[in-house]
């Protein structure tokens, strides 16, 4: 194996190679893949030094900060520094200090450029840090994170304002955090392993993403990420039966429902549709929750959604000074006008209150091609002015139909991300991630909504590679530097000619299959009819949009499920005896194996961790389709999504099987992040442990306990774990792929549970027949409109665990003695549910000359977890929880070490150098020899520590 190290000095590019000492690498590394794909969304991936001489770029898959000298006018490689896992944002504080947020590591790397560039400090922050800015007098560092993560409640920062319990089960909690540090002294208190924030600020929206600073540096703007759009689901139990739209009914609690589901009551072939809930949207004009027919559903909604999206903070006092609502559904980036301070927010606005995919022939309407409008919202003088970037699109004309304008896509921009504004305040540049282009707008026309995309598109800048994610404007050189994620490169654009004049490709450890398949998730130019829609319109960076959609297709036909059904042998007898407990036929037809093309609302599921989860969709209906039928084949199920490119995304044709396989090769490789609620040592709290004991115990929580019936019909009673199977060796994290009948109008597939923690924030649900818990009553403002169950209508896990099928009984259900205590314990356990990766994955610490006492125990923890056995099918089976990597400056470069958990020492590649644990730690006693540790994914340690010949990823300067 060889390692290539590139050094730029005085404009001269030098290369050299060194041999890898194989035997030491093999003994120290865990089994597992050399690379794990996470698909983290870049936020601020490129930055320029204050003096304008150095360009910085994050190498997200490589875990590096890359630096380029701009002295010659073209970026020339200067050095690279290993940071954490999945770096997504970079900011230069001075010419000699750069900060990097590492999304998967829950950390911020402070990189010194003095002497040998290296990490001098690692700040430990909340879950998934995304953006970073500097503002205020004295200067402060502001970092966005989710309102969770192990460090948030670490005893070392217990005295920090805002730190502590994230209150995951408490209503009305702000869930967007900003960690504030003194960058000149990030350790304002002694005894912390990862810095001491001045405060943790929280804002009333869900997990944040972007930050921006006013021109005077005194105001910081904070934006939520997936902030919603004032939509929520009315549960099926609150909707009148029978699809009667004008006939109200009285509900069990004595309140009135305005009628039934808007229908149609059948598909185009006359097959009766299953009863389902419906999506309602708050009408700010008349202050009512309304459906598509304008009917009022206030009696069936128990929360309010203020939809505050962006917040202004005094950078000096850290007090919130303003908030802005209805900015967008998914907010990506922000920028301020350097002349007048106008704030610009790139975003998409979802139309999930419109039902159905397909041509819309039978129902008369469709959401095809009109999923989420690409926008920039202009905020000025307290007013929020959304501007649709693609207002030229006629959404009523579907691709392939008469009158459709096939040229419209050439004027469209998809998934707008980073923005930069000229120093005179007149021109805005926006990175269009799904369009391989940079949009260019006159700011006056943008504010006045007078721009015409058909003519303005002549000024758009095409960029090779695709996945345009970040921008740096270099007016002194007349250049724009553009990060393109698809090919992991930086492009140079001549602003005068609007032509690409140079490109620098960053080393990429991703498998070629990942690189080749990624565009199919995002590329709206190739894979949609109008150039705006893509799979990522809903699956944001391959994850969720935190919304529900009703994507049935009345123009499709009923199909048959091949998936085994828990209680499946019992269901026909219940149907025959009219004992299902339902007020309407199961699945619409009273056939447990029917997939009706109409299904009602379902929340967007993550595309991460699909590989071992069986058939896809909430019902598992992609188990059968275009390319075949299989109950458990995840790959085939993914291929069967091909028609959605036509019926939903809105392309004129669907991809070929070969194209879908390319897509599958990428998407099925993506794994979820480690659980941010579970303890870093993979232990459980007493409550979580009690919940696990019941979950994995023998007591049936659901079904009928009757030996005679079971002998005739097979298993009729199931424990939690027998439905939501946890078997890491098989890749099962809450599902083994079966369906289940649970006393609701449709048979659904049992879902995985790895990301339950990411769905909290909705509190407030009325009484419904399926749930034994009482009406929550009005809970007031909340940050999310969708929670649990397939349709998102159940606010909390605790309420779901009060479902009538889990009712306490003598032989099944929750224990009759203190059932709510056990339900609370199970809720806590599910929020900390096992995942493909151990909680320690990505965690870091930097040992310095002053923090050995505080940071030493964390180093020991990392070493212990690197020796701890772990099982994960996604990682190849039996592995250790992590590979522990360490970096330290030695001589004129940075040396990487890999921990050998058997010998207890650290191995360096060059010359088979070995250092004892104590010897490596002792190096940090010398300023400038700080030692940074990283818990890498099992199997990736040699690549990260020593480099990768396959991709020429070096580790040294």
Question: Can you name each region flagged by the protein language model?
Answer:
Residues 33-66, 285, 289-292, 299-300, ...:
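Beta-strand-rich domains and repeat architectures in extracellular enzymes and scaffolds
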